[in-house]
Amino acid sequence: MAHKWDINNDLIQGDKLNLWLVTGNTEVGYDVLAYATSCSVQVDQETIDTSSKFSCRWNATRGGRSSYTISADALYTNATGVTSFDTLLALMLGDKNVKWAIGQEVEYKVTGENTCEDNPHTLDTNKPYYTGEALISSVSLEAGNNEIASCSISMTGSGAIVPNNPA
């Protein structure tokens, strides 16, 4: 049976996807990057040249090693106990791989008693998400005139990306 396309259920809005890191700040495991504005994963594969006289005029290649990088941007916060620039800098200077996850957060309903600020931003492990380990290769802080200060993180993967697709 052919797939029935449904844009209301098939697509994920960008602000629903977040980066989480294991920082030790909380007891729940993964901590969301505070005030994140974007996150991305890029997966690359090296190519091995297998061209020979039998290839005629065309190059021939095979897949080689795979690698990935993760990057994210966030607004700068001076809040403590959250995954902020200071947390990212400390993790980078620790020279150790960091466990990470990218996925959707548990849906949070804003009601009369609950405000948006009460949202714990918890990784929804009942929906597809990705995990792995990476070394933080750079963190940066940017503060332009008449702008909210922001920070960025770049990580280089160590080992495989693990797709988690709960049934």
Please give the residue ranges for each predicted region.
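Solvent-exposed, non-transmembrane amphipathic alpha-helical segments
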Residues: 56, 92, 156-159
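Short solvent-exposed strand/turn elements
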Residues: 149-164
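Acidic glycine-/aspartate-rich tracts in secreted/extracellular proteins
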Residues: 75-80, 160-162
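Short, acidic/charged, Gly/Pro-enriched secondary-structure junctions
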Residues: 82-130
